[in-house]
Design a protein with these regions (language model features):
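Class I S-adenosyl-L-methionine-dependent methyltransferase catalytic core
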Residues: 1-170
Length: 170
């Protein structure tokens, strides 16, 4: 076997191990700071950013307030359900919504008719349900590698082996 074929085989095996060992059941994956930093340069200062799925300790909330952005946040834990609650004043949404309800989230986002940037799996581009939203155009801000998210058990470090690629859908 050639060295190139062996290397390719090792890379495929590494991807499979990452997929097989990652937690695909937990719907709560938290965004690391480097993924927030990726979107910051595209966010206008002076606008109010709504973080609809964020606690005070989230990387989105901490980084954006640290950088002087005007931020309003809400969370289900505080009785503010994204599908029923809307802050009085806001200009755009930035978030990492629960992937398992992405269709419902997209429907609500488009109903506002305001700008948004949400992290979603890249395969979210596919599907008849989402086509009605994306047919007139969608902007994608992608990463050069898969995001390693945090989960409840690993808040001080990232969890390696994400089973999917994610990007900002804008």
């Amino acid at each position: 076997m050639s060295k190139a074929a062996q290397l390719l085989g090792e890379q495929i095996l590494a991807l499979n191990i990452g997929y097989l060992t990652s937690d695909k059941e937990d719907n709560e994956l938290y965004t690391p700071y480097y993924a927030v930093d990726h979107i910051v340069k595209y966010l206008p200062k002076g606008k109010i950013i709504w973080l609809p799925f964020d606690e005070e300790w989230s990387a989105f909330y901490r980084r954006l307030t640290e950088l002087g952005y005007r931020v309003v946040r809400s969370s289900l834990a505080e009785g503010q359900d994204f599908f029923e609650y809307e802050p009085e004043h806001w200009d755009l949404i930035v978030s990492n919504p629960p992937f398992s309800i992405k269709d419902k989230v997209l429907e609500r986002l488009y109903s506002f008719n305001k700008p948004f940037a949400v992290l979603l799996p890249l395969n979210s581009l596919q599907g008849k349900t989402r086509y009605k939203y994306f047919k007139d155009g969608i902007q994608i801000l992608s990463f050069d590698a898969r995001i390693c998210y945090h989960n409840k058990e690993h808040m001080d470090s990232v969890v390696k082996g994400s089973p999917f690629a994610t990007a900002y859908f804008c």
